[in-house]
Protein backbone atom coordinates (compact mmCIF):
# COMPACT_ATOMS: atom_id res chain seq x y z
CA UNK A 1 0.00 0.00 0.00
CA UNK A 2 2.91 2.35 0.63
CA UNK A 3 4.42 2.01 -2.87
CA UNK A 4 1.27 3.15 -4.75
CA UNK A 5 1.02 6.15 -2.43
CA UNK A 6 4.64 7.10 -3.18
CA UNK A 7 3.99 6.80 -6.92
CA UNK A 8 0.93 9.04 -6.61
CA UNK A 9 2.96 11.68 -4.75
CA UNK A 10 5.74 11.65 -7.35
CA UNK A 11 3.22 12.01 -10.17
CA UNK A 12 1.59 14.96 -8.41
CA UNK A 13 4.98 16.65 -8.01
CA UNK A 14 5.70 16.17 -11.72
CA UNK A 15 2.29 17.60 -12.57
CA UNK A 16 3.00 20.67 -10.44
CA UNK A 17 6.42 21.16 -12.08
CA UNK A 18 5.20 20.50 -15.63
CA UNK A 19 1.46 21.23 -15.73
CA UNK A 20 1.31 21.36 -19.50
CA UNK A 21 3.03 18.04 -20.06
CA UNK A 22 0.81 16.20 -17.58
CA UNK A 23 -2.44 17.25 -19.27
CA UNK A 24 -2.08 15.04 -22.29
CA UNK A 25 -0.66 16.54 -25.52
CA UNK A 26 2.46 18.62 -24.99
CA UNK A 27 2.58 22.37 -25.93
CA UNK A 28 5.75 23.69 -27.56
CA UNK A 29 7.11 27.23 -27.72
CA UNK A 30 6.46 27.38 -31.47
CA UNK A 31 2.71 27.32 -30.86
CA UNK A 32 3.01 30.70 -29.09
CA UNK A 33 5.32 32.33 -31.60
CA UNK A 34 4.85 35.67 -33.32
CA UNK A 35 4.36 35.56 -37.08
CA UNK A 36 6.60 38.60 -37.49
CA UNK A 37 9.70 37.75 -35.48
CA UNK A 38 8.97 33.97 -35.17
CA UNK A 39 9.87 34.09 -31.49
CA UNK A 40 7.83 33.77 -28.30
CA UNK A 41 5.04 36.33 -28.07
CA UNK A 42 5.79 39.29 -25.79
CA UNK A 43 2.78 41.39 -24.81
CA UNK A 44 0.68 39.61 -27.44
CA UNK A 45 -1.70 41.96 -29.21
CA UNK A 46 -4.68 40.41 -30.95
CA UNK A 47 -6.18 42.23 -33.95
CA UNK A 48 -9.77 42.17 -35.21
CA UNK A 49 -8.91 39.43 -37.69
CA UNK A 50 -7.78 37.12 -34.85
CA UNK A 51 -4.04 37.12 -35.52
CA UNK A 52 -1.73 37.91 -32.60
CA UNK A 53 1.68 39.57 -32.72
CA UNK A 54 4.25 40.92 -30.31
CA UNK A 55 3.31 44.48 -29.47
CA UNK A 56 6.73 45.81 -30.44
CA UNK A 57 6.55 43.90 -33.75
CA UNK A 58 3.19 45.50 -34.46
CA UNK A 59 4.65 48.91 -33.56
CA UNK A 60 7.61 48.39 -35.89
CA UNK A 61 5.28 47.28 -38.66
CA UNK A 62 3.09 50.38 -38.14
CA UNK A 63 6.14 52.67 -38.11
CA UNK A 64 7.53 51.27 -41.35
CA UNK A 65 4.30 50.87 -43.34
CA UNK A 66 2.12 53.61 -41.79
CA UNK A 67 -0.83 51.27 -42.31
CA UNK A 68 -3.42 50.07 -39.81
CA UNK A 69 -3.69 46.55 -41.15
CA UNK A 70 -2.69 43.06 -40.13
CA UNK A 71 0.89 42.18 -41.19
CA UNK A 72 -0.26 38.69 -42.18
CA UNK A 73 -3.70 38.90 -43.83
CA UNK A 74 -3.71 42.67 -44.55
CA UNK A 75 -7.14 43.16 -42.98
CA UNK A 76 -7.54 46.64 -41.50
CA UNK A 77 -8.06 46.85 -37.76
CA UNK A 78 -10.63 49.10 -36.12
CA UNK A 79 -9.92 51.28 -33.12
CA UNK A 80 -6.58 50.77 -31.38
CA UNK A 81 -5.38 47.20 -30.67
CA UNK A 82 -4.76 46.28 -27.06
CA UNK A 83 -2.72 43.61 -25.32
CA UNK A 84 -4.45 40.24 -24.98
CA UNK A 85 -4.15 39.92 -21.20
CA UNK A 86 -5.31 36.30 -20.99
CA UNK A 87 -2.85 35.14 -23.65
CA UNK A 88 -0.03 37.19 -22.12
CA UNK A 89 -0.53 35.71 -18.64
CA UNK A 90 -0.65 32.18 -20.04
CA UNK A 91 2.60 32.60 -21.99
CA UNK A 92 4.39 34.18 -19.01
CA UNK A 93 3.41 31.21 -16.83
CA UNK A 94 4.40 28.63 -19.43
CA UNK A 95 7.73 30.16 -20.50
CA UNK A 96 8.89 32.63 -17.82
CA UNK A 97 12.62 32.41 -18.60
CA UNK A 98 12.20 33.00 -22.33
CA UNK A 99 9.86 35.94 -21.76
CA UNK A 100 12.21 37.54 -19.23
CA UNK A 101 15.15 37.35 -21.63
CA UNK A 102 13.12 38.77 -24.50
CA UNK A 103 11.84 41.68 -22.39
CA UNK A 104 15.41 42.58 -21.39
CA UNK A 105 16.51 42.56 -25.04
CA UNK A 106 13.58 44.75 -26.06
CA UNK A 107 14.26 47.31 -23.33
CA UNK A 108 17.87 47.64 -24.46
CA UNK A 109 16.90 48.35 -28.08
CA UNK A 110 16.31 52.10 -28.45
CA UNK A 111 14.63 51.77 -31.84
CA UNK A 112 12.07 49.37 -30.45
CA UNK A 113 11.41 51.56 -27.40
CA UNK A 114 10.87 54.62 -29.58
CA UNK A 115 8.56 52.69 -31.89
CA UNK A 116 6.49 51.52 -28.93
CA UNK A 117 6.26 55.07 -27.60
CA UNK A 118 5.18 56.43 -30.99
CA UNK A 119 2.65 53.62 -31.39
CA UNK A 120 1.17 54.31 -27.96
CA UNK A 121 1.02 58.04 -28.70
CA UNK A 122 -0.90 57.23 -31.87
CA UNK A 123 -3.30 55.21 -29.77
CA UNK A 124 -3.76 58.06 -27.31
CA UNK A 125 -4.57 60.38 -30.19
CA UNK A 126 -7.17 57.91 -31.44
CA UNK A 127 -8.73 57.58 -27.98
CA UNK A 128 -8.43 61.00 -26.31
CA UNK A 129 -11.15 60.42 -23.71
CA UNK A 130 -9.95 59.99 -20.13
CA UNK A 131 -10.14 56.46 -18.67
CA UNK A 132 -12.10 57.70 -15.66
CA UNK A 133 -15.03 58.63 -17.85
CA UNK A 134 -15.53 54.99 -18.75
CA UNK A 135 -17.32 54.26 -21.96
CA UNK A 136 -19.06 57.55 -22.48
CA UNK A 137 -21.74 57.51 -25.10
CA UNK A 138 -19.95 58.96 -28.15
CA UNK A 139 -23.22 60.12 -29.64
CA UNK A 140 -23.87 62.26 -26.57
CA UNK A 141 -20.63 64.21 -26.18
CA UNK A 142 -19.24 63.81 -29.67
CA UNK A 143 -22.62 64.40 -31.24
CA UNK A 144 -23.04 67.73 -29.48
CA UNK A 145 -19.55 68.84 -30.44
CA UNK A 146 -19.97 67.75 -34.04
CA UNK A 147 -23.26 69.63 -34.08
CA UNK A 148 -21.51 72.80 -32.96
CA UNK A 149 -18.87 72.38 -35.67
CA UNK A 150 -21.58 71.74 -38.25
CA UNK A 151 -23.41 74.91 -37.21
CA UNK A 152 -20.22 76.96 -37.39
CA UNK A 153 -19.43 75.50 -40.79
CA UNK A 154 -22.90 76.43 -41.97
CA UNK A 155 -22.44 80.00 -40.75
CA UNK A 156 -19.09 80.20 -42.55
CA UNK A 157 -20.61 78.90 -45.78
CA UNK A 158 -23.53 81.34 -45.62
CA UNK A 159 -21.18 84.21 -44.89
CA UNK A 160 -18.90 83.19 -47.74
CA UNK A 161 -21.73 82.88 -50.26
CA UNK A 162 -23.26 86.17 -49.15
CA UNK A 163 -19.95 87.96 -49.44
CA UNK A 164 -19.13 86.40 -52.79
CA UNK A 165 -22.50 87.30 -54.33
CA UNK A 166 -23.19 90.69 -52.75
CA UNK A 167 -19.87 92.47 -53.00
CA UNK A 168 -18.89 94.41 -56.07
CA UNK A 169 -16.98 92.80 -58.86
CA UNK A 170 -13.27 93.28 -58.37
CA UNK A 171 -13.03 94.92 -61.76
CA UNK A 172 -15.62 97.52 -60.68
CA UNK A 173 -13.74 98.62 -57.57
CA UNK A 174 -12.23 102.09 -57.48
CA UNK A 175 -8.81 100.56 -56.94
CA UNK A 176 -8.92 99.51 -60.61
CA UNK A 177 -10.45 102.68 -62.03
CA UNK A 178 -8.48 105.81 -62.95
CA UNK A 179 -9.30 108.88 -60.84
CA UNK A 180 -10.08 111.15 -63.77
CA UNK A 181 -12.85 108.73 -64.79
CA UNK A 182 -14.64 108.74 -61.43
CA UNK A 183 -18.26 109.85 -61.36
CA UNK A 184 -19.82 112.06 -58.69
CA UNK A 185 -21.16 109.00 -56.84
CA UNK A 186 -17.73 107.36 -56.88
CA UNK A 187 -16.11 110.52 -55.49
CA UNK A 188 -18.64 110.51 -52.64
CA UNK A 189 -17.98 106.80 -52.09
CA UNK A 190 -14.25 107.50 -51.86
CA UNK A 191 -14.93 110.32 -49.40
CA UNK A 192 -17.19 108.22 -47.15
CA UNK A 193 -14.61 105.44 -46.97
CA UNK A 194 -12.23 107.83 -45.23
CA UNK A 195 -14.27 107.47 -42.06
CA UNK A 196 -17.69 108.11 -40.46
CA UNK A 197 -16.84 111.80 -40.05
CA UNK A 198 -16.65 112.22 -43.85
CA UNK A 199 -20.44 111.86 -44.16
CA UNK A 200 -20.67 115.48 -42.90
CA UNK A 201 -19.30 116.69 -46.22
CA UNK A 202 -21.18 114.31 -48.51
CA UNK A 203 -23.92 116.74 -49.54
CA UNK A 204 -21.42 119.52 -50.17
CA UNK A 205 -19.50 117.43 -52.70
CA UNK A 206 -22.74 116.33 -54.38
CA UNK A 207 -24.07 119.88 -54.62
CA UNK A 208 -20.86 121.00 -56.33
CA UNK A 209 -21.02 117.97 -58.67
CA UNK A 210 -17.41 117.01 -57.92
CA UNK A 211 -16.20 114.25 -60.24
CA UNK A 212 -12.76 112.72 -60.62
CA UNK A 213 -11.28 115.44 -62.79
CA UNK A 214 -12.50 118.25 -60.49
CA UNK A 215 -11.29 116.38 -57.42
CA UNK A 216 -7.72 116.35 -58.71
CA UNK A 217 -7.73 120.16 -59.04
CA UNK A 218 -8.90 120.96 -55.50
CA UNK A 219 -6.41 122.56 -53.08
CA UNK A 220 -6.26 123.11 -49.33
CA UNK A 221 -7.50 126.70 -49.63
CA UNK A 222 -10.58 125.59 -51.55
CA UNK A 223 -11.38 122.96 -48.92
CA UNK A 224 -11.18 125.53 -46.12
CA UNK A 225 -13.63 128.03 -47.63
CA UNK A 226 -17.10 127.89 -49.13
CA UNK A 227 -18.74 125.90 -50.56
CA UNK A 228 -16.84 122.99 -48.93
CA UNK A 229 -16.05 124.76 -45.62
CA UNK A 230 -14.06 121.95 -43.97
CA UNK A 231 -13.20 123.82 -40.76
CA UNK A 232 -11.82 120.86 -38.84
CA UNK A 233 -8.08 120.86 -39.53
CA UNK A 234 -7.72 117.13 -38.81
CA UNK A 235 -10.43 116.25 -41.34
CA UNK A 236 -8.93 118.58 -43.90
CA UNK A 237 -5.46 117.08 -43.39
CA UNK A 238 -6.73 113.53 -43.83
CA UNK A 239 -8.59 114.42 -47.04
CA UNK A 240 -5.54 116.20 -48.46
CA UNK A 241 -3.19 113.35 -47.53
CA UNK A 242 -5.46 110.77 -49.11
CA UNK A 243 -5.91 113.00 -52.16
CA UNK A 244 -2.13 113.18 -52.60
CA UNK A 245 -1.97 109.40 -52.55
CA UNK A 246 -4.71 109.23 -55.17
CA UNK A 247 -2.83 111.69 -57.38
CA UNK A 248 0.41 109.76 -57.02
CA UNK A 249 -1.12 106.36 -57.75
CA UNK A 250 -3.69 107.45 -60.31
CA UNK A 251 -6.24 105.14 -58.64
CA UNK A 252 -7.77 104.78 -55.21
CA UNK A 253 -5.38 103.07 -52.75
CA UNK A 254 -6.87 100.02 -50.98
CA UNK A 255 -8.57 100.85 -47.69
CA UNK A 256 -10.03 97.52 -46.60
CA UNK A 257 -9.32 93.81 -46.86
CA UNK A 258 -11.24 93.19 -50.08
CA UNK A 259 -9.70 96.14 -51.92
CA UNK A 260 -6.23 95.07 -50.78
CA UNK A 261 -6.96 91.53 -51.99
CA UNK A 262 -8.17 92.87 -55.35
CA UNK A 263 -4.96 94.87 -55.85
CA UNK A 264 -2.54 92.34 -54.31
CA UNK A 265 -4.07 88.85 -54.61
CA UNK A 266 -0.78 87.00 -54.26
CA UNK A 267 0.54 89.05 -51.37
CA UNK A 268 -2.76 88.87 -49.47
CA UNK A 269 -2.81 85.07 -49.74
CA UNK A 270 0.85 84.84 -48.74
CA UNK A 271 0.39 87.14 -45.72
CA UNK A 272 -2.75 85.33 -44.57
CA UNK A 273 -1.01 81.94 -44.47
CA UNK A 274 2.27 83.38 -43.16
CA UNK A 275 0.60 85.17 -40.24
CA UNK A 276 -1.47 82.06 -39.53
CA UNK A 277 1.30 79.46 -39.55
CA UNK A 278 4.24 81.62 -38.44
CA UNK A 279 3.28 85.11 -37.20
CA UNK A 280 6.80 85.99 -36.06
CA UNK A 281 8.34 85.28 -39.47
CA UNK A 282 5.40 86.96 -41.18
CA UNK A 283 5.83 90.18 -39.22
CA UNK A 284 9.58 90.02 -39.80
CA UNK A 285 8.88 89.82 -43.52
CA UNK A 286 6.68 92.94 -43.30
CA UNK A 287 9.43 94.79 -41.45
CA UNK A 288 12.11 93.87 -43.98
CA UNK A 289 10.23 94.04 -47.28
CA UNK A 290 7.01 96.03 -46.74
CA UNK A 291 7.94 98.55 -44.07
CA UNK A 292 6.10 101.68 -45.25
CA UNK A 293 2.92 100.26 -46.75
CA UNK A 294 2.15 97.52 -44.21
CA UNK A 295 4.41 97.49 -41.16
CA UNK A 296 4.10 101.16 -40.12
CA UNK A 297 0.27 101.18 -40.28
CA UNK A 298 0.27 97.85 -38.43
CA UNK A 299 2.44 98.99 -35.51
CA UNK A 300 0.63 102.34 -35.22
CA UNK A 301 -2.67 100.46 -35.00
CA UNK A 302 -1.74 97.88 -32.37
CA UNK A 303 0.68 100.09 -30.41
CA UNK A 304 -0.77 103.62 -30.72
CA UNK A 305 1.44 106.52 -29.83
CA UNK A 306 -1.14 108.17 -27.59
CA UNK A 307 -2.93 106.30 -24.84
CA UNK A 308 -6.20 108.12 -25.50
CA UNK A 309 -6.16 107.33 -29.22
CA UNK A 310 -8.83 104.65 -28.94
CA UNK A 311 -11.32 107.01 -30.54
CA UNK A 312 -8.99 107.81 -33.41
CA UNK A 313 -10.24 106.72 -36.79
CA UNK A 314 -8.69 103.56 -38.23
CA UNK A 315 -7.95 105.28 -41.54
CA UNK A 316 -6.06 108.02 -39.72
CA UNK A 317 -3.79 105.36 -38.24
CA UNK A 318 -3.23 103.88 -41.67
CA UNK A 319 -2.02 107.24 -42.95
CA UNK A 320 0.39 107.69 -40.04
CA UNK A 321 3.85 107.08 -41.50
CA UNK A 322 5.88 108.46 -38.61
CA UNK A 323 8.69 106.34 -37.21
CA UNK A 324 7.64 104.37 -34.10
CA UNK A 325 8.91 105.58 -30.73
CA UNK A 326 10.90 103.44 -28.30
CA UNK A 327 7.76 102.98 -26.21
CA UNK A 328 5.94 101.56 -29.21
CA UNK A 329 8.88 99.30 -30.05
CA UNK A 330 9.04 97.95 -26.48
CA UNK A 331 5.35 97.12 -26.43
CA UNK A 332 5.54 95.57 -29.88
CA UNK A 333 8.60 93.42 -29.16
CA UNK A 334 7.14 92.01 -25.94
CA UNK A 335 3.95 90.94 -27.70
CA UNK A 336 5.94 89.79 -30.73
CA UNK A 337 8.07 87.48 -28.58
CA UNK A 338 5.43 85.95 -26.30
CA UNK A 339 1.97 86.54 -27.82
CA UNK A 340 2.36 87.14 -31.56
CA UNK A 341 -1.21 86.12 -32.32
CA UNK A 342 -2.45 88.82 -29.95
CA UNK A 343 -1.02 91.41 -32.34
CA UNK A 344 -3.21 90.04 -35.13
CA UNK A 345 -6.25 89.95 -32.82
CA UNK A 346 -5.71 93.58 -31.78
CA UNK A 347 -5.35 94.66 -35.39
CA UNK A 348 -8.57 92.83 -36.36
CA UNK A 349 -10.33 94.38 -33.35
CA UNK A 350 -9.79 97.87 -34.77
CA UNK A 351 -11.47 96.78 -38.01
CA UNK A 352 -14.70 95.53 -36.44
CA UNK A 353 -16.72 98.45 -37.82
CA UNK A 354 -15.45 97.83 -41.35
CA UNK A 355 -15.39 94.01 -41.41
CA UNK A 356 -17.96 92.89 -38.86
CA UNK A 357 -17.89 89.09 -39.26
CA UNK A 358 -14.49 88.68 -40.87
CA UNK A 359 -12.75 90.47 -37.98
CA UNK A 360 -14.50 88.20 -35.49
CA UNK A 361 -13.34 85.10 -37.35
CA UNK A 362 -9.78 86.45 -37.28
CA UNK A 363 -9.95 87.22 -33.55
CA UNK A 364 -11.31 83.77 -32.68
CA UNK A 365 -8.68 82.10 -34.85
CA UNK A 366 -5.90 84.14 -33.21
CA UNK A 367 -7.08 83.05 -29.74
CA UNK A 368 -7.23 79.39 -30.79
CA UNK A 369 -3.77 79.52 -32.36
CA UNK A 370 -2.40 81.08 -29.16
CA UNK A 371 -3.87 78.22 -27.13
CA UNK A 372 -2.39 75.63 -29.51
CA UNK A 373 1.00 77.31 -29.26
CA UNK A 374 0.81 77.17 -25.45
CA UNK A 375 -0.01 73.46 -25.66
CA UNK A 376 3.05 72.94 -27.87
CA UNK A 377 5.31 74.69 -25.39
CA UNK A 378 3.80 72.70 -22.52
CA UNK A 379 4.39 69.44 -24.39
CA UNK A 380 8.04 70.33 -24.96
CA UNK A 381 8.49 71.30 -21.31
CA UNK A 382 6.74 68.24 -19.87
CA UNK A 383 8.77 65.87 -22.05
CA UNK A 384 12.07 67.61 -21.19
CA UNK A 385 12.72 68.34 -24.86
CA UNK A 386 14.04 71.88 -24.43
CA UNK A 387 17.29 70.85 -26.13
CA UNK A 388 15.35 70.19 -29.32
CA UNK A 389 13.96 73.76 -29.49
CA UNK A 390 16.76 75.14 -31.76
CA UNK A 391 16.35 72.21 -34.14
CA UNK A 392 12.57 72.67 -34.16
CA UNK A 393 12.97 76.40 -34.85
CA UNK A 394 15.31 75.75 -37.75
CA UNK A 395 12.99 73.09 -39.19
CA UNK A 396 10.06 75.47 -38.89
CA UNK A 397 12.00 78.29 -40.55
CA UNK A 398 13.08 76.00 -43.38
CA UNK A 399 9.53 74.70 -43.88
CA UNK A 400 7.95 78.18 -44.00
CA UNK A 401 10.70 79.54 -46.26
CA UNK A 402 10.37 76.60 -48.65
CA UNK A 403 6.60 76.99 -48.83
CA UNK A 404 6.93 80.73 -49.49
CA UNK A 405 9.52 80.16 -52.21
CA UNK A 406 7.39 77.43 -53.78
CA UNK A 407 4.37 79.73 -53.83
CA UNK A 408 6.38 82.60 -55.36
CA UNK A 409 7.68 80.32 -58.11
CA UNK A 410 4.37 78.74 -59.09
CA UNK A 411 2.09 81.70 -58.38
CA UNK A 412 1.68 82.66 -62.09
CA UNK A 413 0.54 79.11 -62.87
CA UNK A 414 -2.09 78.82 -60.12
CA UNK A 415 -5.66 79.63 -61.29
CA UNK A 416 -7.30 82.59 -59.57
CA UNK A 417 -10.24 80.40 -58.52
CA UNK A 418 -7.90 78.08 -56.61
CA UNK A 419 -6.26 81.05 -54.89
CA UNK A 420 -9.66 82.41 -53.85
CA UNK A 421 -10.63 79.02 -52.44
CA UNK A 422 -7.41 78.84 -50.43
CA UNK A 423 -7.89 82.40 -49.19
CA UNK A 424 -11.46 81.89 -47.99
CA UNK A 425 -10.61 78.50 -46.51
CA UNK A 426 -7.89 80.00 -44.33
CA UNK A 427 -10.08 82.95 -43.43
CA UNK A 428 -13.38 81.28 -42.51
CA UNK A 429 -12.88 77.52 -42.14
CA UNK A 430 -9.50 77.36 -40.42
CA UNK A 431 -10.96 78.61 -37.08
CA UNK A 432 -13.43 75.70 -37.10
CA UNK A 433 -10.58 73.22 -37.62
CA UNK A 434 -8.59 74.85 -34.81
CA UNK A 435 -11.55 74.47 -32.43
CA UNK A 436 -11.41 70.72 -33.00
CA UNK A 437 -7.63 70.70 -32.44
CA UNK A 438 -7.96 72.62 -29.15
CA UNK A 439 -10.61 70.19 -27.89
CA UNK A 440 -8.36 67.23 -28.73
CA UNK A 441 -5.43 68.84 -26.90
CA UNK A 442 -7.58 69.44 -23.81
CA UNK A 443 -8.78 65.84 -23.82
CA UNK A 444 -5.23 64.58 -24.24
CA UNK A 445 -4.12 66.73 -21.31
CA UNK A 446 -6.93 65.33 -19.16
CA UNK A 447 -5.86 61.81 -20.11
CA UNK A 448 -2.25 62.49 -19.07
CA UNK A 449 -3.30 64.03 -15.74
CA UNK A 450 -5.67 61.21 -14.88
Swiss-Prot record:
Description of post-translational modifications: Mediates RING-dependent self-ubiquitination leading to proteasomal degradation.
Domain of life assignment: Eukaryota
Gene inactivation effect: Bfar-deleted mice show a twofold higher levels of PNPLA3 protein than in WT animals with no associated changes in PNPLA3 mRNA levels.
Residues modified by glycosylation: 232, 308
Region listing for Disordered, in residue ranges: 1-25
Membrane-spanning segments: 141-161, 332-352, 361-381, 405-425
Feature: compositional bias, Basic and acidic residues: 1-20
Keywords in alphabetical order: Apoptosis, Endoplasmic reticulum, Glycoprotein, Membrane, Metal-binding, Transferase, Transmembrane, Transmembrane helix, Ubl conjugation, Zinc, Zinc-finger
GO molecular function ontology, one term from the record: zinc ion binding
PANTHER family per UniProt: BIFUNCTIONAL APOPTOSIS REGULATOR
The protein's role, per its UniProt record: Membrane-bound E3 ubiquitin ligase that plays a role in several processes including apoptosis regulation or reticulum endoplasmic stress. Has anti-apoptotic activity, both for apoptosis triggered via death-receptors and via mitochondrial factors. Contributes to the dynamic control of IRE1/ERN1 signaling during ER stress by inducing BAX inhibitor 1/TMBIM6 proteasomal degradation. Promotes the activation of TGF-beta signaling by mediating the 'Lys-63'-linked ubiquitination of TGFBR1 which is critical to activate the pathway.
Protein name (Swiss-Prot/TrEMBL): Bifunctional apoptosis regulator
Organism name: Mus musculus (Mouse)
